[in-house]
Swiss-Prot record:
Its cofactor is [4Fe-4S] cluster. Pfam families: Radical_SAM, RlmN_N. Its EC number is 2.1.1.192. Specifically methylates position 2 of adenine 2503 in 23S rRNA and position 2 of adenine 37 in tRNAs. m2A2503 modification seems to play a crucial role in the proofreading step occurring at the peptidyl transferase center and thus would serve to optimize ribosomal fidelity. It is an enzyme of class 2 (transferase). It comes from Xylella fastidiosa (strain M12). HAMAP family: RNA_methyltr_RlmN. This is Dual-specificity RNA methyltransferase RlmN. It is found in: Cytoplasm. One of its GO terms (biological process) is tRNA methylation. GO terms for molecular function: 4 iron, 4 sulfur cluster binding; metal ion binding; rRNA (adenine(2503)-C2-)-methyltransferase activity; rRNA binding; tRNA (adenine(37)-C2)-methyltransferase activity; tRNA binding. The lineage of its organism: Bacteria, Pseudomonadati, Pseudomonadota, Gammaproteobacteria, Lysobacterales. S-adenosyl-L-methionine binds at residues 192-193, 224, 246-248, 332. It comes from the Bacteria.
Amino acid sequence: MNGFAVIPSVTTTTTSGEPIASDVARKQNLLELDREGLERFFEDVLGEKRYRAHQVMKWIHHRYVADFEQMTDVGKALRTRLQACAEVRVPRVVFDKHSADGTHKWLLAMGTDRKNAIETVYIPDKGRGTLCVSSQIGCGLNCTFCSTATQGFNRNLTTAEIIGQVWVAARHLGNVPHQRRRLTNVVMMGMGEPLMNFDNVVRAMSVMRDDLGYGLSNKRVTLSTSGLVPMIDRLSTESDVSLAVSLHAPNDKLREQLVPLNKKYPIVELMASCERYLSVNRKRDSVTFEYTLMKGVNDKQEHAHELAKLMRQFDCAMQVKGAAKVNLIPFNPFPGTCYERSTEVDIRAFQKILLDAQILAMVRRTRGDDIDAACGQLKGQVVDRTRRQAEFRRTIEDRVGRDVAA
């Protein structure tokens, strides 16, 4: 998995439809490679010592230089060879938006055809700056309360497209790893299910945590999953980042409505996989369980008591108080949704039940909702391959039709 990637052949066409060979398509995008992959590329393809790869990696991820000619401590002969067989191709910024609260959102074009685009969000806070990164164009899991799900699914992002989001944001922010940090945390909580794009996500997270990359500690990189049990087990053996689970319901009946994946991996199996994750990764002492609160759906007191019991069971299984942390997320509405945000009174009452049960529970402050950058609102631009967009539009039209008739 860590070897240098072989870029698939890509061709363009003339106006008459005849294929034209693309020199760019044959070049290795160095953003695809982690440290080991870059070392192998320099040794096997360029015939260079591995330490030369370290020089170039720092130019790319510390100084945000994409032009080999600007890498002044790299010899001219090597720069010439790099120009011939490699490139640093970063995502193109379609537009960026600033929120009144300081949140920043980028729409980034993906792929050579530029038809698809994903969203990346930077959330500044006191003493920290968190980047929310996407892993797929769209999402195939169809969670009913998530805006991304209404867009359908196109494809997985490449490693370069994932780490390219970090590159674009870090460059914009003037981030200097190990010195002037504006980017202190990365959360794989953007568009898509990260564990359905396992290899590319793990490789990108390796660059995020590498001292030659962005130098983030393992605990400052968080992967959020809807609950692919076998892949959580695999992740435990290949990475030790922080784990978050999109739970959103305390029982299987309700969770199957909100997160259809629960039909395949019910809560008991999901919780067991989280226990195994912490058992393997001794440096991690907790799992964060995300719970989006929706009015009249999952925000009742009985739901809070059920959730508290589930979290206590997890703490007992791990024999660690606070092994389960709950992140309560007020629902962020989007066009066409049938859900509403819980009232502030109900949110605080829900949290109090958890706190009274000695469960660590915090309410996530809504950020960036004025630019549709809040949790659950990311949408991007997806050429749907699942026909879900059409189904969602029909649902909205049917609902509008009923309202008009009434």
